[in-house]
Regions:
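Residue-level preference for beta-strand/loop junctions
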Residues: 4, 32, 83-85
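Unchanged
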Residues: 41-65, 73-123
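Conserved Nudix-box catalytic region and its N-terminal flanking loop in Nudix hydrolases
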Residues: 18-57
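Generic structural signal for beta-strand residues in well-ordered domains
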Residues: 3, 12, 27, 99-102
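Conserved N-terminal beta-strand and adjoining loop/helix that marks the start
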Residues: 1-20, 37-40, 71, 90
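Short active-site-proximal "capping" loops at secondary-structure junctions
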Residues: 26-27, 71-75
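Short glycine/serine/proline-enriched coil/turn segments at secondary-structure junctions
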Residues: 2, 28-29, 79-80
Length: 123
């Protein structure tokens, strides 16, 4: 039976139009992978509840409102017999960046220009 994974992420912009990314180090010998803040929807959670929780954990910011669904992508990994459905929501926030990821994977959270985002997401 295929494992179904649901992921929710936030697209957060600062007052200068820069995009918030978090740097993840999942034990890859110091190699940091940048993503939108977000994560797996846990049993009993809605996608929006997961997004709010993950943004708080990974960045210290509080989601003020979730405005709309910006995009959805589905990825299948036949080797692992998994299908991941990832959703990114445009949201607004308040507070200051203060990452406190309980899993210990977030090594950085900061806003990037669109050019910097493109460079960070290549890897």
């Amino acid at each position: 039976m295929r494992r179904e994974i649901l992921v929710a992420a936030a697209i957060l912009l600062d007052s200068r139009g820069r995009v918030l990314l978090v740097g993840n180090d999942w034990g890859r010998r110091g190699r940091v992978r940048y993503t939108l803040p977000g994560g797996t929807v846990e049993p009993g959670e809605t996608a929006v509840e997961a997004l709010v929780r993950e943004v708080r954990e990974e960045t210290g910011l509080r989601v003020r409102s979730v405005e709309h669904l910006a995009y959805v992508i589905q990825v299948e990994d036949r080797r692992k017999n998994e299908r991941t459905l990832a959703m990114a929501f445009r949201a607004t926030y308040e507070g200051l960046l203060n990452p406190r990821d309980p899993d210990g994977h977030i090594v950085e959270a900061r806003f990037f220009t669109l050019e910097e985002v493109e460079e960070r997401l290549k890897g």
